[in-house]
């Protein structure tokens, strides 16, 4: 009975595979939104103010960071929890493939969240004259919460590895 239960639990890791595949569909949706934004802004690029153009570029950077985060979580999560990726040796391989454990993945995710939050904060500051000070204060508090959390996670990770 114990053996059957253990085998069933071990096999249940495959339930994560469709979830990671679903993330790839999320990446596709993000790419479509990215190119929709590019196609939308290009005809009007000369009519945009510098500040508006910077806001659009920040949105594109934000989407690229989220896309990178999706790829990282999707691939390393699959490798860590489901199965090793069998990639042909003749194909290009990501240098971190097979090297990112769940601890380093958490740190990369935390760093990505801080970077994404920084871009959102910069976007908010660029429109600061139209935003209430309470909103700005809470945005900074939330961002600093992400920063402190990422720092604490890194510090705890360093403590547990030594």
UniProtKB/Swiss-Prot annotation:
Coiled coil: none
Classification via InterPro entries: UPF0114 (IPR005134), UPF0114_bac (IPR020761)
Domain of life, per lineage: Bacteria
Compartments reported by the entry: Cell membrane
Keywords on record: Cell membrane, Membrane, Transmembrane, Transmembrane helix
GO cellular component, one term: plasma membrane
Positions of transmembrane segments: 10-32, 53-75, 109-126, 135-157
Protein name per its UniProtKB record: UPF0114 protein PP_0682
